[in-house]
């Protein structure tokens, strides 16, 4: 249970921007406020079921691919030194419900995929959210292949083509 709480806490700031936006800042509980406010906020942003067996099993295919091909973000844990029980433990490899030792990370997979998309991908439309932290890894595309990349202003991980400005 303590590992689930620690990992959910580390996920909180990333998930806040992945699925929310700056308007959600007002909902952040004040320092020194009641613990229930923090629990409610975490439930709203991350979900209290985030580290449940059901969620871990549901996301296992993604976590496996993140651990072996996609990579993942690293949480900033410097401010938590001395209070964590699992420092640097929040990693996709720790979330997969089986031994990951036989499956190393291959850092070449995604650059190869992106290279193919840019060189050969035709009629591809990529829509990213301006505020989605995953957009820092946005693929490049080539207009000569009739492919385009757009960032939805103020958008998050749920950005979609209909929400793009009319000019795009």
Regions found by a protein language model. Name each.
Residues 77-78, 128, 133-138:
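Conserved alpha/beta-hydrolase "acid-adjacent" motif
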Residues 126, 149-151:
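Conserved beta-strand scaffold positions in the cores of enzyme catalytic domains, especially
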Residues 58-60, 117-120, 141-144:
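Extracellular/periplasmic catalytic domains that process cell-envelope and extracellular macromolecules
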Residues 120, 126-128:
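Short beta-strand/loop motif that positions the catalytic acidic residue
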């Amino acid at each position: 249970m303590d590992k689930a709480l620690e990992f959910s806490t580390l996920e909180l700031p990333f998930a806040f921007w992945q699925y929310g936006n700056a308007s959600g800042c007002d909902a952040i509980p004040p320092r020194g406020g009641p613990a229930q406010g923090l629990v409610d906020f975490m439930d709203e942003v991350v979900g209290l079921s985030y580290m449940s067996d059901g969620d871990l099993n549901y996301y296992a295919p993604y976590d496996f691919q993140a651990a072996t091909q996609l990579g993942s973000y690293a949480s900033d844990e410097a401010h938590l030194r001395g209070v964590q029980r699992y420092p640097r433990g929040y990693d996709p490899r720790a979330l997969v419900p089986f031994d990951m030792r036989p499956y190393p990370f291959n850092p070449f997979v995604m650059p190869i995929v992106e290279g193919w998309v840019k060189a050969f991908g035709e009629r591809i439309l990529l829509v990213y959210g301006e505020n989605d932290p995953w957009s820092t890894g946005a693929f490049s595309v080539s207009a000569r292949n009739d492919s385009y990349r757009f960032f939805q202003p103020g958008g998050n991980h749920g950005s979609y083509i209909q929400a793009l400005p009319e000019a795009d």
